[in-house]
Structure formats: C-alpha cells, structure tokens
Regions:
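N-terminal regions that are enriched for targeting/export leaders
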Residues: 2-34
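A non-catalytic, amphipathic alpha-helix used as a structural packing/dimerization or gating element
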Residues: 13-24, 104-115, 141, 285, ...
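Acidic/histidine-rich alpha-helical segments that form the ligand environment
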Residues: 14, 80-126, 130-134, 212
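Active-site-adjacent bridging/hinge elements
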Residues: 19-31, 86-90, 114-121, 260-267
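Generic, well-ordered alpha-helical scaffold segments in large soluble proteins
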Residues: 21, 25-28, 55-59, 115, ...
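Short, contiguous alpha-helical
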Residues: 32-87, 121-169, 177, 213-218, ...
Length: 330
C-alpha cells in the first residue's frame, strides 16, 4: 500500500478538532467523577484522556529523533494492551489507582496536545502523516468509549455540552431489501488511512440475501420481551442463557418497567421507550436470541458491508453508509 500524505493544514485541523471534542466531553464533570470505574468493562474518564495522549507519545517517539517519554510511571498505567511497551495495567482495576492524579492527567493531556501541534506545523513524511492520522482515529474511538462509560457512570446526571432535543424518528414500514449475491471485494485498497484489520482487500462470495430496511426497533424488541423471550432457553446460545440467569437479564441495559410501561434512562433523564428508535444496549447473546425468536439471523460482516456501502450507480463502495461526506459535528 502506498501511503497518502495529507495536506499539513488538514491534519492539524483534524487533530485540533479531535482534542477539543474530547475535552468537551468531560467539560461538565466534577473532579471526583474522573477517577471512578463502575464496572470491569468500563474505564475511568481520566484513563481515557491519559491513554489517548500516551498513544500520541508513541507516535512522537516513532517520528521524532531522541524523543523522551513524559513519565515511565504514566506508561505503566495508561498502556491498554500493547505488550511491546510493557505489561499493561489490568483493565478491571484502572479505577483503583489514584495516581496519576486528575490534575496530572489534564496537565499531561494539554502538554501532549502542544507537542503534537508543534510537530504538525512542520513538514511530515508520509509514514509520519499516517501514524498521526491513526492516532486521531484512535482518539475518536475513545470518544465513543468515553460516552458510554459516562452513561454507565452518571446516567442523566451527566450534562453533555452538545446535548440536543431528541428528534422522534418517524414510523416506517418495514420491508426486506433483496441484495444480489456474487463476488464482492472486502477490505481496503486505497492510499488513505485504514487499520491493518482492513487489509488486504480480498474477494468473498455472497449468496443472494435479504436485509431489513432499518435496525430492530424498541417496539420489535419489546414484542420479544413480552413473548417471554428472556424466559425461554430455546432462543439462547448456551453461554447466553447462562448470562441471562447469572446477571438476571430481563431487558436491555438502562430499561426499567414502571407499572405497565417501559422507560429508559439516558442523558436527558428517564423517558418512555420510543417504539420507533433502534434498540440499543443489547449484547451479542440478546441479539442472537431475538433473531432466533423472529425467525431471522444476524448478517455476516461481508453481507452488512455490501448492504451498507455498495453503490450500484457508481459500481463501487462508499466510505459511509450515506456516501463519502464525513459526518457533521452534530
């Protein structure tokens, strides 16, 4: 793959925007919030801020001569699973560490932002441009992780800066869309950024298949619940049924029943389930059980990629399901 070199001002703008968005996500937190870990599968907010900065330091060390890391002790705590940089700290115990402190992490975040900004104002090699692009995408991933960790941590006590009124989705008529099979090219073959798991581009054979025109809705999933879906082992994989019993699952995470009505809790507070919204916060096991109950199945990775990205008119894939234009800030 030949690496594409991004224009200097484009990469710098992307980096600055990304760092600003991360800080925006934690802007309304109290200091006591930053170090709390509410479950083994979440991470404290301060860890996310430190980790994305630490990865930027990894990139700096690979692109700048004689680069010295800010702190070896920081590296031990902020490493996630990169064994070449030492033994990672146990994810389930990230919230047990009081050091580095919140103030130290915020100072570290600001320092690394300045260091990378200085570098991005100078000419870069294609390899360096690729690595800094990777670190930007990596931070965007952690923004997503940070949001769902904050929901688990604070629920409707969290006050996002950009929280807007939720638009009620329209009621759509469900239909199955027929997707023709044949040879389909998966993966990436361009000169821009991609993760290594997208390489190499390769051909796969798909049979004809059908896929619904919109994701499973709250209404559809509620039908599964009310039909005893969580009480009938025949819909569940063995490990899934064990999880149902062990964790006492009876509905998606954040759902609760009040009288005869179902509610969910999110950043706007407790509200009635909107029947037309896509169901969220279900596990793989729950998704599989629903599909078996509905007489359907989950799409394969290749099927979903073709259904979501293939454009018949131009005979090629789009970058996003809606086209090639990047998502807006909202």
């Amino acid at each position: 793959m030949t690496l594409e070199q991004k224009p200097q001002n484009t990469l710098l703008k992307q980096f600055e925007d990304t760092r600003s968005r991360t800080l925006e996500l934690v802007k309304t937190l109290e200091k006591d919030d930053f170090g709390v870990q509410t479950a083994y599968f979440t991470s404290p907010p301060k860890w996310h801020l430190g980790h994305v900065s630490w990865l930027n330091e990894i990139v700096l060390s690979k692109t700048q001569k004689n680069y010295e890391f800010y702190s070896e002790e920081f590296s031990k705590y902020l490493n996630s699973y990169y064994n070449q940089f030492g033994k990672p700290h146990d994810k389930a115990k990230r919230g047990l560490m009081s050091r580095p402190t919140v103030d130290q992490i915020l100072e570290y975040y600001d320092l690394i932002t300045k260091k990378v900004t200085d570098v991005l104002q100078k000419p870069l090699t294609p390899e360096a441009s690729y690595l800094f692009t990777m670190s930007i995408h990596h931070e965007c991933q952690h923004q997503e992780l940070l949001v769902y960790d904050l929901q688990h941590l604070l629920g409707d006590q969290y006050r996002p800066v950009r929280l807007t009124n939720i638009e009620k989705p329209p009621s759509l008529e469900q239909e199955s869309i027929k997707i023709p099979g044949g040879i389909y090219k998966m993966g990436y073959s361009g000169n821009g950024f991609c993760y290594d798991i997208e390489l190499p581009e390769h051909k796969v054979h798909l049979d004809d298949f059908e896929i619904e025109n919109f994701p499973v809705t709250n209404f559809q999933y509620l039908e599964f619940i009310e039909d005893g879906g969580y009480n009938d082992f025949s819909f569940w994989l063995s490990d899934g049924w064990d999880s149902v019993k062990k964790n006492e699952w009876s509905a998606p995470m954040y759902w609760e029943k009040d009288g005869d009505e179902w509610f969910t809790r999110d950043f706007v507070g407790k509200r009635k389930i909107n029947p037309n919204e896509p169901v969220c916060h279900v596990s793989f096991y729950e998704a599989m059980a629903f599909c078996k109950w509905a007489g359907k199945r989950l799409p394969t990775e290749a099927e979903w990629e073709k259904a979501a990205l293939w454009d018949d008119e131009r005979n090629s894939k789009t970058i996003f399901p809606w086209g090639d234009e990047p998502p807006t800030k909202n």
